[in-house]
Amino acid sequence: MADICIGCHLSTSDGYAAMGRRAVEIGANTFAFFTRNPRGGNAKPLDPDDVAELRRIMGEKDFGPLVAHAPYTMNLCSSTERTVEFARTAMADDLRRMEELPGNYYNFHPGSHVKQGVDRGIELICEGLNQALFEGQHTTVLLETMAGKGTEVGRSFEELARILDGVRLDSYMGVCLDTCHVNDAGYDVAGDLDGVLDEFDRVIGLDRLKALHVNDSKNPCGSHKDRHEKIGEGTLGLDAFRAVVTNPRTRTLPMILETPNDLAGYKKEISLLRGIAASVEA
Ligand code: FE
Ligand code: FE
Ligand code: ZN
């Protein structure tokens, strides 16, 4: 059986090829990165040589798909028109730039409806996606499962399903399941991963599940908090991650660590989880 595909969030500050090299150094074969500065403004144009070098590294080291992350400040369903406008422009621009790195994922937080209500929120998110997605694109856009902090949309599988229902080019859409977020949203991912996956399948369809954010949580199930913890040191515990890296329905997906760590810490978590996955295969 193939090795798991796992990595962490990396900084773009030294360019794309540097992220690939750093990933290899810490034993990763995928990674996440922010597509632009979260403070807004224009994104740097991609340097074609830098991107080509990353693609070479990814091929040589047999990387799985990358899971790019839109900036947290991008809110397609804000109550402020300027914020919505920025989100729409940023997403469309990100998807055009992602074409330089075809075949990867672009994950984003559906948004916060800021007292407009979840129905209006979902409507705005769908409008934004329908503007940004284009026929023939080579990126799959992932909705992230959210903890349900404040007025976050995407706190339940039902809300994600309603967004997917409203997107015209939905063959370019999928879901990224964040283990900390679904726990905080009230799904017992630690106690009953199979039950949560069955529920996901019933409401959304497991064919939509494309990637995982692998995080422990500082808070109990249903707390709606969204505070990540190191693997095995939170309320989910190591057994939860043993299940994630060995379950046939999740072990083949790209897994991104967003735990509070430096690179050395990520390297340790990657080798820990690879070790567990390998021990079960044998
Ligand atoms: Fe996220
Ligand atoms: Fe996440
Ligand atoms: Zn989070």
Model-derived segments and spans:
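Acidic/histidine-rich catalytic cores of soluble enzymes
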Residues: 31, 126-229
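Conserved active-site loop/cleft motifs that coordinate metal ions or position small ligands
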Residues: 32, 210-213, 252-259
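Acidic (Asp/Glu)-rich catalytic clusters
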Residues: 21-27, 47-67, 92-102, 130-137, ...
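N-terminal pre-domain/capping segments
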Residues: 1-70, 74, 78-96, 279-282
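Active-site beta-loop-alpha junctions enriched in small/polar residues
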Residues: 9-13, 36-38, 70-73, 111-113, ...
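Active-site acidic/histidine proton-transfer and metal-coordination neighborhood
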Residues: 60, 76-174
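Conserved, mostly hydrophobic/aromatic
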Residues: 23, 69, 87, 98, ...
